[in-house]
Amino acid sequence: MSKDVIEYSKLFAKLXNTNDDTKLDDTIASFLYYMFPRELFIRAISLLESSDMFIYILDRVHNKEGNEHTSLIDVLVDEFYKGSSNSLLEYRLIVKDTNDGAPPILVDIAHWFCSCEEFCKYFHEALEKTDEKEELHDVLINEVDDHLQFSDDRFAQLDPHSLSKQWYFKFDKXCCSHLLAFSILLRSSINVLKFFTVNSNKVFVIAIDNIDEWLNLHINIVE
């Protein structure tokens, strides 16, 4: 699965059915199923349809009048798809753990991290297989400094705003359904984002305009 050949984010973008905005494209979904191990893609889609995924946005200036939900989606579109956000958006990607009493799962696609057991397991396995002479950076990150080799793919991309280099986390070393699900949502297309947040209303976008509530969100994650 070479980054030079496959642009995953473009494949994710085709998941939304162009003829019916209430359905996913079965052909693209079937193709993606075989591109990830451990039924990872199926688990990611199931997660997107589970109503257990949340995007919390620290909202200091949001106008509470009118359609708040649509406005929040516009904020996400500006941040992840148009790059037109005037300020750094503070947000958290959270998944409700289905195990009773377990803390919420924190997902960070910008730095390719997830607090779930699956990600930690494969991350540590990658570390154990690392030769003592190898740098961790070389083991887990693919660095591209040749502009001719640059890719438009945004899946597992780190620091996408750099103009001199591209970095991709080697997701075949460590990936989980949570990272894949949020990547499908936020590293694909506006249509896919709206499919899960607006059309099917399975992923919830929630504004927090109180700093105390924002801090409590983080406390609940680490407890």
Swiss-Prot record:
Chief place of localization: nucleus
Cell compartment(s), UniProt: Nucleus
Keyword Magnesium: no
Gene Ontology CC annotations of this record: nucleus
Signal recorded as keyword: no
GO term, biological process aspect, one: DNA repair
Entry keywords, A to Z: DNA damage, DNA recombination, DNA repair, Nucleus
Record text on subunit structure and interactions: Component of the SHU complex composed of at least CSM2, PSY3, SHU1 and SHU2.
Family according to the record: Belongs to the SHU2 family.
Function: Plays a role in a RAD51/RAD54-dependent homologous recombination repair (HRR) pathway to repair MMS-induced lesions during S-phase. Required for error-free repair of spontaneous and induced DNA lesions to protect the genome from mutation.
UniProt name for this protein: Suppressor of hydroxyurea sensitivity protein 2
Species this protein is from: Saccharomyces cerevisiae (strain Lalvin QA23)
Biological classification of the source: Eukaryota, Fungi, Dikarya, Ascomycota, Saccharomycotina
Gene (UniProt): SHU2
